């Protein structure tokens, strides 16, 4: 019903373990949207301590592991030439830029992070910034800067988004 409301007419939703999609649907999809489970830092409210109740460093590590598995599966399920959008509602670099860096290391030149295409002008523009170049002394690949961090404001909750194009097959025989 949500897809119909948005005017999407050619959509396949996967119900099941997303980390296994690629095993059943290897290089089958033109477009993939991976809105990954995360530590939800972008949804914290300063005046509501309840929003941080389940946050911990351990939660970030747990989510990072899950996200890496999901992103691997999403890339493997994407057709060469296809586009994947990876998003989270957290600011943790381990879950965002770190996850992208791991994918680049795993897939090499078969994937490319391209500009996320968020507006450079208008009411949201002041809240949009490029992905981090480094975190805690660890440099990320330059391509990771093409991702976008959106800071929370009166219009939006905070989130992270990256657009990845699959340049060639990732199936290795």
Task: Show the residue positions of the predicted features.
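S-adenosylmethionine
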Residues: 1-173
């Amino acid at each position: 019903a949500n897809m119909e409301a948005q005017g999407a007419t050619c959509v396949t939703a996967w119900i099941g373990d997303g980390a296994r999609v690629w095993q059943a649907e290897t290089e089958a999809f033109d477009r993939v949207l991976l809105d990954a489970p995360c530590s939800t830092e972008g949804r914290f409210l300063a005046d509501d301590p309840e929003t941080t109740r389940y946050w911990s460093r351990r939660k970030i590590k747990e989510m990072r592991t899950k996200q890496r598995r999901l992103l691997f599966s999403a890339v493997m399920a994407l057709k060469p030439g296809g586009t994947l959008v990876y998003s989270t509602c957290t600011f943790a670099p381990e879950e965002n830029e770190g996850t992208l860096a791991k994918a680049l290391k795993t897939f090499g030149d078969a994937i490319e992070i391209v500009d996320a295409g968020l507006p450079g002008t208008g009411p949201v523009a002041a809240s949009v910034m490029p992905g981090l170049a480094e975190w805690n002394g660890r440099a990320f690949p330059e391509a990771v800067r093409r991702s976008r961090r959106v800071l929370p404001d009166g219009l939006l909750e905070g989130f992270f988004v990256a657009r990845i194009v699959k340049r060639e097959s990732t199936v290795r025989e």
